[in-house]
């Protein structure tokens, strides 16, 4: 893939004395692994650009799973994330690295990612709404289609005052028992609209995305989530 395309660095680590190994999310090629030769050398003009949350244009090529970065240009300065929004951005980056297959195109998700990072950079309050919207978008692009507005058992429209239990691969069914896998009809409407007007709907959205993402993450915990827990007291 030798043409220019938009991209963000998800993660980087030293590779040999002068190079970097990059995990990069691109608009056209999805997630790719690139070697940036000489990027760590003192004369390299790439070091400052190859940072997370910096909008890039990149060219790369080669055979095999690991490609070679040919060129990279920063489109703008890095989006300003700090404190809780920085940890949130690192979480989003790790989530993409963990669940997306290599070199599978997710052009629409790329823009969902961009909008999420922009929302985090401009957040004046909690980053949670932006995170929940991105998680729901990610699940949708992975083929995790859930009908939030209809009962899987009867097909009836959900009622705001009723409780529904989530069943993986089936959807939501009416339930009289309330536990971690149950949601009110009001919660389900918020999930469908990706709008969370209060803490109650935000907490419900977080519960749902944790349940839905678990099969993709396996048993290995997210490092960024642990950092986030240390930075933000449990609510």
From Swiss-Prot:
SUPFAM superfamilies tied to this protein: ArfGap/RecO-like zinc finger, Nucleic acid-binding proteins
Keywords: DNA damage, DNA recombination, DNA repair
HAMAP family, sorted: RecO
Gene behind this protein: recO
Top-level lineage group: Bacteria
NCBIfam families registered for this protein in UniProt: reco (TIGR00613)
InterPro entries for the chain: ARFGAP/RecO, DNA_rep/recomb_RecO_N, NA-bd_OB-fold, RecO, RecO_C
GO terms (BP aspect): DNA recombination; double-strand break repair
Protein name per the record: DNA repair protein RecO
Role, per record: Involved in DNA repair and RecF pathway recombination.
GO cellular component, one term: bacterial nucleoid
Organism name: Enterobacter sp. (strain 638)
Lineage of producing organism: Bacteria, Pseudomonadati, Pseudomonadota, Gammaproteobacteria, Enterobacterales
Family membership noted in the UniProt record: Belongs to the RecO family.
């Amino acid at each position: 893939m030798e043409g220019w395309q938009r991209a963000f660095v998800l993660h980087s680590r030293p590779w040999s004395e002068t190079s970097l190994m990059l995990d990069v999310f691109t608009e056209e090629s999805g997630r790719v692994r690139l070697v940036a030769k000489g990027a760590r050398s003192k004369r390299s003009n790439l070091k400052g650009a190859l940072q997370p949350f910096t909008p890039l244009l990149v060219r790369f090529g080669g055979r095999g799973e690991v490609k070679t970065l040919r060129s990279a240009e920063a489109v703008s300065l890095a989006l300003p994330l700090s404190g809780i929004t920085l940890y949130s951005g690192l979480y989003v980056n790790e989530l993409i690295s963990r669940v997306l297959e290599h070199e599978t195109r997710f052009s629409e998700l790329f823009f969902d990612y961009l909008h999420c990072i922009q929302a985090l950079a401009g957040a004046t309050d909690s980053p949670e709404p932006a995170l929940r919207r991105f998680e729901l978008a990610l699940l949708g692009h992975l083929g995790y289609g859930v009908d939030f507005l209809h009962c899987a058992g009867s097909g009836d429209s959900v009622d705001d005052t009723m409780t529904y239990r989530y069943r993986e691969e089936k959807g939501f069914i009416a339930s009289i028992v309330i536990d971690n896998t149950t949601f009110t009809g009001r919660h389900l409407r918020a999930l469908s609209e990706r709008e969370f007007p209060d803490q109650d709907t935000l907490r419900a959205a977080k519960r749902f995305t944790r349940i839905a993402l678990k099969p993709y993450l396996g048993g290995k915990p997210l490092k960024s989530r642990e950092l986030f827990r240390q930075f933000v007291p449990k609510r």
